Regions:
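Short aromatic/basic micro-patch
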Residues: 49, 81, 106
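Short beta-strand His + acidic residue motifs that chelate non-heme Fe in jelly-roll/DSBH
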Residues: 64-66, 82, 88-97
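Short acidic-glycine-tyrosine-enriched beta hairpin
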Residues: 69-84
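A hydrophobic/aromatic-rich effector-binding and dimerization subdomain
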Residues: 2-3, 91-158
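Short, charged/polar surface micro-motifs in flexible loops or helix N-caps
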Residues: 60-63, 85-87, 108-112
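A short, acidic/glycine-rich surface segment
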Residues: 39-44, 88-92, 114-115
């Protein structure tokens, strides 16, 4: 019988799933991860609730991801935004995992509350994110996103490819 129980996923626990050489961050409040397939990622095939804010950008590859029991096909140039308490599960990982490449930004609610963010705007757009947390970025935004992620990596000391 398949184990379908959920568990809470914190940033500290999330970091355990990826090699230290592929991640950087600020204690357990902020983490930037260059996600390549690793056997430890199979743990994400079990439902979990992330207790912070997570943004996952698909550089290359296809996986299926369930967010709040809705299944999404994640492909190149997709941006996934998960809000606190979202139920997450990787539902399908392709056999050829060499081509999978994602960049993940995860932050605690406490860290996010310290950022200068217009929460009125976030809340109004947050309703849309609850309905559809997966966005396919237009081609002109893809290059801008790559530059932004490179800048974040440089400032944090990470080495993203």
């Amino acid at each position: 019988m398949e184990n379908t129980s959920t568990y809470n996923l914190s940033i500290s626990r999330l970091k355990e799933y990826f090699p230290a050489s592929h991640r950087t961050g600020i204690s357990d409040d902020f983490c930037l991860i260059d996600v390549r397939f690793d056997g430890r990622m199979h743990k994400l095939e079990h439902p979990c609730r992330f207790d912070g804010i997570m943004m996952l950008y698909c550089v290359k590859g296809n996986v299926k991801l369930s967010i709040n029991l809705n299944e999404y096909e994640i492909a190149d140039n997709s941006l996934i935004v998960c809000l606190p308490g979202n139920l997450l599960k990787v539902t399908e990982i392709p056999e050829d995992t060499d081509g999978l490449h994602y960049v993940m930004i995860a932050m605690s609610q406490n860290f996010a509350s310290g950022l200068r963010i217009d929460f009125k705007k976030v809340l109004s757009e947050g309703v849309a994110l609850l309905k559809d947390p997966v966005i396919t970025l237009p081609e002109n935004v893809k290059e801008l996103t790559a530059h932004y992620l490179s800048l974040m990596a440089e400032l944090s000391g990470a080495e993203l490819e």
